[in-house]
Amino acid sequence: MNRPDLIRFLALPLLAATAIPAVAQPPAVTPTQSAPPAGQVVLPPPMAVMPPPVPLPALSQAQDDWANEWLKSGMAEGLMARSKPTAPMHGQQLLNALLDRGRALSTGRVDTADFLEVWALRPAAFDPRPSLAKAIAEDRLPQWAASLTPPYSGYDGLRKGLATYEKIRDTGGWPSLSAGASADVVRARLALEDKSVTGTEPLTAALQRAQRRYGLNPTGLLDARTLTTLNVSVDDRIAAIMANMERWRWMPRELPVNRVQVNIAAAVLTVFQGDEPVTSMRAVTGSPTNQTPMLSSNIHSIVVNPPWNVPMSIARKELFP
């Protein structure tokens, strides 16, 4: 729907979620056809002929060297947990590797056939071959590579965060905190993720920043939820970032500039106007057992202070013993 008065709604998982289709489409009506006259032979319709794949030009030596070096960036893009040394590739093997990397960066590594049925957001089909052939012919491989990743600040932020956490992991990670940890120990732990933490800053302010970053209530206290969150291992943090980068690859390449966006994991709703956040508020989202749908739909109307009764399906699954 393209009416300008409609606001787009997106529910996006940033840690884990499932989804349901946003709009149910009515089944297509197949027109009835009369039977052919007796004795008439009906020929089957001709099969569609698939066009041949776009041929890929041979790589120059400079392009060959650049491509082999670029393929080492898989860890930086969240495609692998650790860098793996590989022998240089050449010829068709290298071209195939470029095609595979192009698909992975544009639409993710999960085959659409493996998507859960209830996930509504699916990546659009993408064939990297035509654009790769053009980039080779025009000697613009770096520009082609830059065009593959999602054009969102959220993805760029995750990429930068991934580099930060990989450095923390490579220097030994962080120790677990206890409930009775001293202020200096807690401050040192927070400083690993937040370089603005100083020895003279009140611990309350540093804790509040960390709590906001993790979608927690910014009490400034080292409560049970905050302690549990800070004690998540750096490897688990890296895995979560990589999963979120993959989900960004499933998103459409253009989001409506006027939209309501929900961070399911943090339970925060943000209103965007002109592609800029103008307000945010807490939202009610599900749990790992009863997950919030991942969807994209249109908001047609808003009911203020609506009467609401617990649906029987929710009552049976979540309330009744």
How does the language model describe each region?
Residues 20, 65, 76-89, 180, ...:
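N-terminal processing/targeting junctions
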